[in-house]
UniProtKB/Swiss-Prot annotation:
Gene transcribed to yield this protein: Msh3
Annotated binding of ATP, by residue: 850-857
Compositional bias segments (type: Basic and acidic residues): 43-54
The protein's name: DNA mismatch repair protein Msh3
Keyword RNA-binding: no
Region feature (Disordered): 1-84
GO cellular component: MutSbeta complex
Function summary: Component of the post-replicative DNA mismatch repair system (MMR). Heterodimerizes with MSH2 to form MutS beta which binds to DNA mismatches thereby initiating DNA repair. When bound, the MutS beta heterodimer bends the DNA helix and shields approximately 20 base pairs. MutS beta recognizes large insertion-deletion loops (IDL) up to 13 nucleotides long. After mismatch binding, forms a ternary complex with the MutL alpha heterodimer, which is thought to be responsible for directing the downstream MMR events, including strand discrimination, excision, and resynthesis.
Domain of life: Eukaryota
PANTHER family, A to Z: DNA MISMATCH REPAIR PROTEIN MSH3 (PTHR11361:SF122), DNA MISMATCH REPAIR PROTEIN MUTS FAMILY MEMBER (PTHR11361)
Amino acid sequence: MPRGKSASGGSTAAGPGPGRQTVLSRFFRSAGSLRSSASSTEPAEKVTEGDSRKRSLGNGGPTKKKARKVPEKEEENISVASHHPEAKKCLRPRIVLKSLEKLKEFCCDSALPQNRVQTEALRERLEVLPRCTDFEDITLQRAKNAVLSEDSKSQANQKDSQFGPCPEVFQKTSDCKPFNKRSKSVYTPLELQYLDMKQQHKDAVLCVECGYKYRFFGEDAEIAARELNIYCHLDHNFMTASIPTHRLFVHVRRLVAKGYKVGVVKQTETAALKAIGDNKSSVFSRKLTALYTKSTLIGEDVNPLIRLDDSVNIDEVMTDTSTNYLLCIYEEKENIKDKKKGNLSVGVVGVQPATGEVVFDCFQDSASRLELETRISSLQPVELLLPSDLSEPTEMLIQRATNVSVRDDRIRVERMNNTYFEYSHAFQTVTEFYAREIVDSQGSQSLSGVINLEKPVICALAAVIRYLKEFNLEKMLSKPESFKQLSSGMEFMRINGTTLRNLEMVQNQTDMKTKGSLLWVLDHTKTSFGRRKLKNWVTQPLLKLREINARLDAVSDVLHSESSVFEQIENLLRKLPDVERGLCSIYHKKCSTQEFFLIVKSLCQLKSELQALMPAVNSHVQSDLLRALIVELLSPVEHYLKVLNGPAAKVGDKTELFKDLSDFPLIKKRKNEIQEVIHSIQMRLQEFRKILKLPSLQYVTVSGQEFMIEIKNSAVSCIPADWVKVGSTKAVSRFHPPFIVESYRRLNQLREQLVLDCNAEWLGFLENFGEHYHTLCKAVDHLATVDCIFSLAKVAKQGNYCRPTLQEEKKIIIKNGRHPMIDVLLGEQDQFVPNSTSLSDSERVMIITGPNMGGKSSYIKQVTLVTIMAQIGSYVPAEEATIGIVDGIFTRMGAADNIYKGRSTFMEQLTDTAEIIRRASPQSLVILDELGRGTSTHDGIAIAYATLEYFIRDVKSLTLFVTHYPPVCELEKCYPEQVGNYHMGFLVNEDESKQDSGDMEQMPDSVTFLYQITRGIAARSYGLNVAKLADVPREVLQKAAHKSKELEGLVSLRRKRLECFTDLWMTHSVKDLHTWADKLEMEEIQTSLPH
């Protein structure tokens, strides 16, 4: 239908009514007006998009007539050429040329290269405009202003901040002057609103809700286009990009995974309520509703409907997020002497907002920062909160930790001003926070417990409190009695980061994945929270005999029980969602109705089914640990499920969420008002039937537009003049009588107010549920323990696993033990060769030699892993095992330099060894693999010999020492009661080709590895055999074999000389001297004696 015609069929075409002027004003506004403002029923930005489309479609033909009906105020801002269409066609190319000339002025030789590149791109963008364009002159003026604004904005970006425009722009924003003098263009109200929010959150990428989509502006748009692979274009004064609202969670997660802090800005008012408000002529009000980083991904914006909507592909946006720790590090330098050495006191606080877990620690660390590295390796944080100034060794460690990760796994680093870490400021922050948060009867004790923490911990805690307040997540810190100390020497075995890495306890060293690690072998859990707890068990083996045996008793109970009760409980666990994360999301009041319903319904079903199993549990479960866990699980959550309307909760309809509104009087009142309006509209239907003389007339609803009266076009003449035409087709027309118009407007206002009221009541409902948070968390922790026990029981069922015997004595006795990971990886087709171990006070050191690739490193790792599994509370891969409690495990394995620390391979070895010497105790297990390599043979032997002797004589720990230096084995003669020499068994095979070729062609011996630990010394390492297996060229092998034979002959000769002259020195008679000479002649070495 031509635009010139009236919506009512032409009856009002004589003059533009108020409604018509409202429509026209959308298309023709002054340069300083709000282009994105809308009618009373549409979001502003939605109209903006429509305007641009309608303008481009309506500038030709029929709409030229319409353009002359613009009000005078609007016409004053339009170019004079608009009154002379013919002249305007001639002027438009000139305007384009002027814009290009203006653009060339900015591309001066003094401009930066990147400025020139950007301006050239803008010139190309402008040249695309046709020479005889159909755009209005006002549109061309805005295009020219946008080009100039983009150029000035790029210069301002390079001059100052990486976000948004230059400081001058922010100054103008604060002064409420929507005019950019540098670019001579006008900021729209939406842009001013964005600038104001951007000034408050300069370090965040902002997603701004605009109707049915979220928009990015400025550099945020360029970041989004680059990282999300979406389209970015120039609009007014900023580059802009957009995403649909229903895909927000996908794109927010992707940006967060890249390391960005992302803010979500939402509209805080609706069209109907805005129409009756005081600011109905201004832009929609918006505010920042959520901030997200890698550690704070909590909220319904980023959590899709897991297990309620099968169409959502979770793998599309997230990987394994089992641990999302935020780790805050603070270091307190000591006196000048310690400062020179690099020693200092370090405090760390780690929080996992997704689960509510809080850990802390305070420790003394050396210049190597090994203790801090251990905490980072154990927690594997995704985000670090650091002071702006740290010591050089710590900065190098942080750089190394963040650079090790790849792609989206990179650790995000957040810096905070040093002032917030100062003790006086931190103490005030902590006391104010807990004085406000703690109001229970035990509040004073909790507050005193926090204040009595070490100073570095308080400083780190204050920074965490301040940081989490940005995300409204500080509530998780309100229960300091639930804080856990990360490394307690009285509770957990000491395992540093080097040991975690060398033993591949959490991830393998090949591709840094879980497969091939100890955690992978033990993990048969059915729940996410159980998997997280098992990881803590693996990295923190127990020290208390009673707790270890309690776990072993529970595993044994599950393993040997013939009842089906355990299988039924395991099936219940398999059905559970991630209740721990869900409860934490509820506690922070960031969950959706779907998530709340899923969590509460799952807990209610679990409770009822466990209640039915309680008789069988009491009669068949012998373990006190399991019985206590299951009984304490029961928690009253049925009340909250009964209140909810399931179908409404699943679709997120908060207006119909509550069944009984007696506890929600505000919602009840609002619904009554809505019903009254609907009732009055229905009552008027009889009157409309009489007017139209249609007894069967009914309201119709089309495309969401309600209460329309539909009349055939042939009967339109009977419609009263004051009725408003809403829409039409070829057959019918639809109208709203004046009463319906007013009532429908009131109805929409009440409905939108109902939504706001329901949101407020929903938050209050979550607050009420949050009172049970800590009780329910305790129940979930018990469930996680049950899941871990079931997982360890599955490991024990694999075959040839035994229950270890734990003792307080210092001993490790293993009969036919196997390496847990290699045993599983080889499978049944390749049989792993078992080996036994016997370490105790009678023989606490094993010196292990043998050929390369003979299995020495695998053997010492096997002994260590079996010990760790025993103290976790797991069955172990052996026929028998008796393990004395080990307070710490220290390893020095491998050979690699450290470029970040500027250390060579040999320096790295000695640094780790020095740290072990300082930390190890008589109750520790020490593993040293080929210490001394990387330098000359004499220096290597000397260091290896002296270090091992120190451990034997002074440290007195259980030690496994692997070496290729035969002189080290002589320590067995010096300490026969403490040291034993062993080697990995092998067979030397004579090569037939070698025999055929004769002595002229030397080839290395062929060695068959037996992989069996055997008492005694291996005189040779048979390295040439490894070269042969590696397909080293034959001529190289021949030369190497010949040289090896020659060197062995020289060494043997020197040894014989030494023995010969030792015997001569011990000779006391002529007879003995003749005997020595005869022996010398017999051995035929006279000619080799020195002259």
